[in-house]
């Protein structure tokens, strides 16, 4: 159970970082 929770937590963090970088690149590209 702990491995599944940590896996989903890591997936959520990776998704957040990816979306944050994507938004940052989009803003830079927009300017």
From Swiss-Prot:
Subcellular location: Plastid, Chloroplast thylakoid membrane
Pfam families documented for this protein: PetL (PF05115)
GO biological process per UniProt: photosynthesis
Disulfide bonds: none
UniProt keywords, alphabetically: Chloroplast, Electron transport, Membrane, Photosynthesis, Plastid, Thylakoid, Transmembrane, Transmembrane helix, Transport
GO cellular component annotations of the record: chloroplast thylakoid membrane; cytochrome b6f complex
Membrane topology: Single-pass membrane protein
Entry-linked SUPFAM superfamilies: PetL subunit of the cytochrome b6f complex
GO MF, one example: electron transporter, transferring electrons within cytochrome b6/f complex of photosystem II activity
TM stretches of this protein: 4-24
Family indicated by similarity: Belongs to the PetL family.
PANTHER family: CYTOCHROME B6-F COMPLEX SUBUNIT 6 (PTHR37266:SF1)
Function as written in the Swiss-Prot or TrEMBL entry: Component of the cytochrome b6-f complex, which mediates electron transfer between photosystem II (PSII) and photosystem I (PSI), cyclic electron flow around PSI, and state transitions. PetL is important for photoautotrophic growth as well as for electron transfer efficiency and stability of the cytochrome b6-f complex.
Subunit note: The 4 large subunits of the cytochrome b6-f complex are cytochrome b6, subunit IV (17 kDa polypeptide, PetD), cytochrome f and the Rieske protein, while the 4 small subunits are PetG, PetL, PetM and PetN. The complex functions as a dimer.
Protein name (Swiss-Prot/TrEMBL): Cytochrome b6-f complex subunit 6
Organism name: Pelargonium hortorum
Gene it is expressed from: petL
């Amino acid at each position: 159970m702990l491995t599944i929770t940590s896996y989903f937590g890591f997936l959520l963090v990776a998704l957040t970082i990816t979306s944050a970088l994507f938004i940052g690149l989009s803003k830079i590209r927009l300017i």
